[in-house]
Structure formats: structure tokens, C-alpha cells
């Protein structure tokens, strides 16, 4: 609808230029927003205030001329002037109802991408291997997955890339410890304890640390024995990761893994190509790129180091190799990096180096989708009581157990197997939604009691809202036929629900553009609240006549499908009953 209004305004502007009311050459960005007060319209534009000065007119006078120049459109019932010169558009309820009827009959719910489909690389999760995933990996994994799902639903070709840390000092440390204490497969499967023991030896013994560093060199040189053991550790670690992904209901698979080691053979080429492009400068024996726009606090150039004095490579080198691969081989139009906000400077520098070196094709977008920190109740990074790192799998276990206790209290008569199934959906969804519903750039405090509440903007509330819709159709007694009848919007609650349903397409396009799943969460929460008001004020099964009942059933059906689709895109499992 906003696009329609923008087009109408553009046609009016063109007409006013032709009539000499407006000067030629104006190219304003036409802004159309949802009106806050629906009694004053559904949409508002400040275009008259934007162009009043170049037109040499008062904003309200220009607004009157714009209204007179607007072409008629069946989707707009009237346009009014408000305040200093806002244009308020009222949408035609019959046209709105017709759009919702079309959405109900469309598997895509009338959702279409605003623009051409693209090939999009989504870089997400990226845990360091050799130990189990911890809570610090949650945000990248689920935010990236949610955005990837939305992009796919809109028609983009999405290439998930799990850039795992599968190379480096930690593997030398593990190999050295394995030489000292040969372990069985069962012992190795307990990666956390094995890693902890190896790390303790590394910290306490310089001789052990030296041997570990030597094994890293052998590994990088392609030593067969080291590579065999490294592969064993990597496979065990990836198996742990995959179990966690499945628990989280994210779509990452082993085929999406493209770790640091995948780019090893190209790192020397990256350095050579940077040198050939005239970008490299030697500084204290290291190979660096200096970009004028990046400087330290004392105004000295800030280097991007791509090769250490000893010949070793750094994260920047690997990231540059990955960028080139994603551009030249994967042919990506866009690459989204869901990585901690604290890496913002790193990515700004690496992206600029990649562009100057010609590693990305013209028009390719490189975007760092940074996120804040998950904190504990004390406002500090989330830790165990003894100050250790919280394993992600332990967090999910506790969420499920807490959800089980909660659900059992409310439904003591439900069979044990069903209770466990409900608890799994509620517990995992609660953890994910508590994160996804916050702006990704914000820090937030983890609180089990808040996230498991059935009130407020939480997963349990939304899951229950969906079961409430499903309950309407269970009580109907006969299969609902979506091909019959039409939506008619009479009551205010019907109109408000319908207007929000019509914004699903816009909402998903916003998520795709900005990488912000919290926008979808806010939409679904809003929708659930509007359905509740509709349900309480507009009898569905007790409607006044069959036509009204079918209209309201159609509204309920579209609400249910929209809620389910939205929750599914966020990676949340819906339930038919709770």
C-alpha cells in the first residue's frame, strides 16, 4: 500500500511540475509512514512540508494542490490535510478486504520482494571448534538464521556460510595433549573437559606450549599424522555443533561449513595480489595495508595486518580470501556478516581493502550485521555461578525443564509425552524469541522468568495466540473451506486487524533490508494483540449470519497462517494446542 501511495504522490508531483507549480529537477525521497492515530488516516506523508520551500508556498497550500493533483485510486477512500501540512491517506476498506482475500488464496500470503531477487551469502554462527558451543554463539546463529529464512521466503537464493574456527593454536594444543594422553573416542567426545585439560597444560608448561606451537607449524605444513588427528577433532566438534543446531531448529547443515582452513591455500595469493595492487606496506617486518580514513586516537594510520613478521597469516587475511571466494565463485550480490558488534572496525577495514584490491565485483554489497551482548541479571556478560562460560546445550536443557514445570502446572491432566513435546517447543522458542525480539545492536539481560511468561512480548504468549486461532477451527466442527465467501470489514476491530495483516509484506521486506528480526517479532506481537481484541469483540462462530461468520473465519484463518509463517521464519516451532 505504501508503494501505491508513493506512486500516486509521484504522479501528482509530475503534474504540478507540468503546471508550473513546482520547479523542474526535484527528486525528493517520498516518505510514507503508518499513521499513529487511525482516526486521522492509515498512512501519512510529509511531502508538502519537504517541498514547500522550493515551491515558494506554505506547506498547507501546497498540500491542497497535491490533493487536487492526486489521481483517483480504488485503494484510497480519501486524503486529508493534518497539522502543518501532512497528507493523511485513508485506505478503502473494500479494497483492503479484497487484498486480504487474495493473500488467503496465495501460498506466499501475497508476500513479494521489493526489487529483484539476489544471491545472498549469510555468514552466521562461526563457532571456534575443539570445544562445545557456548551462549556467545547464540545470537549470530539464530539472528542470521532468521534473516536467511526471510530472504529465502522473499525469493532470494541464500547461501549459508558457517565460517568455523577450525585452524590455529588451539588445535596444536589438543594434538600435543593427545600425544601425552592417548584418548578413546568416548573420552574425545567430551570435548569440553579434554580442551580444558589441554589448556591447563598449555598455560602451566612452557615446554608443552612450545610443542603445541610446533605441531601447529607441522599441521599447516600438511603433516599427514597431524592432519588425521585434526580431522578427527574437527569432525567430533562439528557433530556437537550440528546437534545444537537441530535443538535450536536452525537450518545450518554440515554442507554449510566453510571454515578458516578452507582458505589456507589462497592466503599467499591474497598477500601477493594485495602487493600487486600496490596496497601493501612493510611495517616492523609485517605486511600491512594502511587506509587513510582509519586512524588511531593519536591520528596515526591504523594498519590492516595481513601477514606477520614471522610469515603467519591473520583473521584479516582469511576474511579477504573468503570475500573473494564469495564474490568470484559464489557470485553473491550481497554478503551479510552476523558477527559481534565489537568487530565493526575490523569489518569496515577488511571490506574497504577488498574493494580497493578488486576482490569484489561491482555492485556487490558487504554488510556487517553487528549485534550486542547477552548479559546476566547483573548486566555483565552471561556466565555460570563460578564465572565460567555457559554451554549453549546446558542453557537449552534448563529452558526445557523450566518450561516443562510451567506447562505441567497449567495442564496436569496432559500425558507425559505431550508435556515433554510442548515443553521442548516452549522452552527453545522462549530462549530464541527473547533474543530475536531485541534489536540486534542492543545488549540485553537474560531472564528465564521473563522469557517464559505467558504475558507480554514473549514466545509463550505468541505460541498461545496461535493455538487460540487453531482452537476456533477445531470448534467449527467441519473443515474450513477457504475458497468460499469474502472478507467484509465492518467492526473497528476487524478493520484494525485487517490493516495489520496487510503489512506482513512490508514487514518482511524491512527485515530483509536491515537484518533486523525484532521488526518481525514486534509485528507478530501486535498481530496477536489485535486478534485477541477481534476475538473478544467480534463473535466468530456466534456471528449474526453465515456470511459474517465466513468473513470472520477468513480473517481468523489469515491471521493463523500469518502467525505460523512468521514464527516459522524466526525458527520457532508452533503448536496446535497448549
UniProtKB/Swiss-Prot annotation:
The keyword Aminoacyl-tRNA synthetase applies. Keywords: Aminoacyl-tRNA synthetase, ATP-binding, Cytoplasm, Ligase, Nucleotide-binding, Protein biosynthesis. It is an enzyme of class 6 (ligase). One of its GO terms (molecular function) is ATP binding. InterPro entries: aa-tRNA-synth_I_CS, Arg-tRNA-ligase, Arg-tRNA-synth_N, Arg-tRNA-synth_N_sf, ArgRS_core, DALR_anticod-bd, Rossmann-like_a/b/a_fold, tRNAsynth_Ia_anticodon-bd. Pfam families: Arg_tRNA_synt_N (PF03485), DALR_1 (PF05746), tRNA-synt_1d (PF00750). The keyword Magnesium does not apply. Its main location: cytoplasm. GO terms for cellular component: cytoplasm. Its EC number is 6.1.1.19. It catalyses: tRNA(Arg) + L-arginine + ATP = L-arginyl-tRNA(Arg) + AMP + diphosphate. One of its GO terms (biological process) is arginyl-tRNA aminoacylation. A motif ('HIGH' region) lies at residues 127-137. It is found in: Cytoplasm. Belongs to the class-I aminoacyl-tRNA synthetase family. Monomer. This is Arginine--tRNA ligase. The lineage of its organism: Bacteria, Pseudomonadati, Pseudomonadota, Gammaproteobacteria, Pseudomonadales.
